């Protein structure tokens, strides 16, 4: 597939040809990365075609978060990131499959069915932005937008062999993103390489008065300032690596060796056990999800139950029929931790611990430029691999720290395992220092020159 950098130099006629080619490929593909062929969404604005995750509003398109409860909902306005794409010679072209309401790590909970990993169709593409990553890796998209609440851009990028960037919280507007966990959610790019990630990030970043959590900063110019000659002081967290598979640990050590040979300084640091981060993340995210999803009641928009007797039954049946099992589980647990008698014991303590984790990151960043970790404990696993929801939650162990602290992080493919599946590693940077993330990743990408096809 042509890169985003290359596509931006095409004429309008050449772009129309490219869109027709992508549409034909999607129709012929069995990956189920797109919810439907891009042309079926209606007319697309002029510009380089960018695949959009199904929780980002595109005016006139049916946007469902891959959930039955939003069946038939037509977005009445553009998300701010879509407006930003239009201002930078790009446009939405198709909606990607995802875990329902972004609650999952495998893209198995979508009401549209599973998405397959293009590297091995018997394996998951990761999630929740699995459709976006599978499409980019499978040659079905030039680039894509995803959202990252606990690793939902970085983990599928790692599983599929793409570059995935979670920007600093507040760097990219969330206006028009259908919320899962408002204090964690962030929109970001999934691309074929670091240059494309930089270009797409620059296009969507910047202050937005319609988002009260948007940082009052100008759009970034990371692509213009990309510098692979810069050298950094990079921290590693040895205690956190024990949960990774042997092959991920080997890829980690080999990448560390490459970073040292490139002239970067590696130092060891310590943090609170990452298992605590899992508990904190899920308490807070489920609490916020139970609040955010209360609006889907069958009255205002989306699916409405039929043959009901009264308003109470309308609420009950609409939500029971519309939400999938994982979403129901998180709503119930979220209501539990917010209930009288448990708010102080769980939610309040989790928020206090979240602040402590953020302070730990800030302390480390007083002495280093970047932190280097795996993205996931393993490479992409088979479908129906997790015996319990808890096992799936533990797969986020390396990614959720950046969300808890609002820091930017980037996933880069660095190796292949014994089955030829991609393995990604992650850099985390100080708040609003995406430039350093992209600089070090750009240099490492050039150094490793990994061939996945």
Curated annotation (Swiss-Prot):
The keyword Protein biosynthesis applies. Belongs to the amidase family. GatA subfamily. NCBIfam families: gatA. Keywords: ATP-binding, Ligase, Nucleotide-binding, Protein biosynthesis. Allows the formation of correctly charged Gln-tRNA(Gln) through the transamidation of misacylated Glu-tRNA(Gln) in organisms which lack glutaminyl-tRNA synthetase. The reaction takes place in the presence of glutamine and ATP through an activated gamma-phospho-Glu-tRNA(Gln). The active site is at 53 (charge relay system), 128 (charge relay system), 152 (acyl-ester intermediate). One of its GO terms (biological process) is translation. Its EC number is 6.3.5.7. InterPro entries: Amidase, Amidase_CS, Amidase_dom, AS_sf, GatA. PANTHER family: GLUTAMYL-TRNA(GLN) AMIDOTRANSFERASE SUBUNIT A (PTHR11895:SF151), TRANSAMIDASE (PTHR11895). It is an enzyme of class 6 (ligase). GO terms for cellular component: glutamyl-tRNA(Gln) amidotransferase complex. It catalyses: L-glutamyl-tRNA(Gln) + L-glutamine + ATP + H2O = L-glutaminyl-tRNA(Gln) + L-glutamate + ADP + phosphate + H(+). Heterotrimer of A, B and C subunits. This is Glutamyl-tRNA(Gln) amidotransferase subunit A. Coiled coil: none annotated. SUPFAM superfamilies: Amidase signature (AS) enzymes. It comes from Helicobacter pylori (strain Shi470). Pfam families: Amidase.
């Amino acid at each position: 597939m042509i890169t985003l950098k290359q596509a931006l130099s095409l004429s309008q006629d050449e772009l129309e040809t490219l869109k027709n080619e992508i549409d034909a490929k999607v129709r012929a593909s069995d990956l189920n990365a797109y919810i439907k062929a891009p042309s079926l969404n209606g007319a697309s604005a002029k510009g380089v075609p960018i695949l959009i995750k199904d929780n980002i509003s595109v005016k006139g398109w049916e946007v469902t978060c891959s959930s039955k409860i939003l069946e038939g909902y037509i977005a009445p306005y553009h998300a701010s990131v879509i407006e930003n794409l239009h201002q930078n010679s790009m446009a939405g072209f198709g909606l990607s499959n995802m875990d329902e309401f972004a609650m999952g790590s495998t893209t198995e909970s979508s009401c549209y069915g599973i998405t397959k990993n293009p590297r091995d169709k018997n394996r998951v593409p990761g999630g929740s932005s699995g459709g976006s990553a599978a499409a980019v890796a499978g040659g079905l998209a030039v680039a894509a937008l995803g959202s990252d609440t606990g690793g939902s851009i970085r983990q599928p990028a790692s599983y599929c062999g793409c570059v995935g960037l979670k920007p600093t919280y507040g760097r990219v507007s969330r206006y028009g993103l259908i919320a899962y966990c408002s204090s964690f959610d962030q929109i970001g790019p999934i691309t074929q390489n670091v240059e494309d990630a930089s270009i797409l990030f620059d296009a969507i970043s910047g202050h937005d008065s319609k988002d009260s959590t948007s940082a009052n900063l100008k759009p970034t110019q990371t692509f213009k300032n990309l510098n692979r000659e810069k050298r950094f002081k990079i921290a590693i967290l040895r205690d956190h690596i024990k949960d990774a598979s042997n092959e991920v640990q080997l890829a980690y050590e080999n990448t560390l060796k490459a970073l040292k040979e490139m002239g970067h300084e590696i130092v060891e640091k310590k943090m609170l056990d990452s298992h605590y981060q899992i508990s904190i993340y899920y308490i807070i995210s489920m609490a916020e999800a139970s609040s955010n999803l209360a609006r889907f009641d069958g009255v205002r928009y989306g699916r409405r139950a039929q043959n009901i007797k009264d308003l109470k039954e309308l609420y009950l049946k609409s939500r029971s029929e519309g939400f999938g099992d994982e979403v129901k589980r998180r709503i119930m647990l979220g209501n539990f931790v917010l209930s009288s008698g448990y708010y102080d014991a769980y939610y309040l303590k989790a928020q206090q611990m979240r602040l402590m984790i953020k302070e730990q990151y800030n302390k480390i960043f007083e002495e280093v430029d970047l932190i280097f970790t795996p993205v996931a404990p393993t490479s992409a696993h088979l479908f129906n691999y997790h015996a319990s929801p808890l096992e799936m939650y533990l797969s986020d162990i390396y990614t959720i720290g950046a969300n808890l602290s609002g820091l930017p992080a980037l996933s880069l493919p660095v190796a292949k395992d014994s089955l030829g599946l991609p393995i990604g590693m992650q850099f985390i940077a100080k708040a609003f220092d995406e430039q350093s993330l992209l600089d070090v990743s750009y240099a490492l990408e050039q150094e490793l020159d990994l061939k996945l096809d």
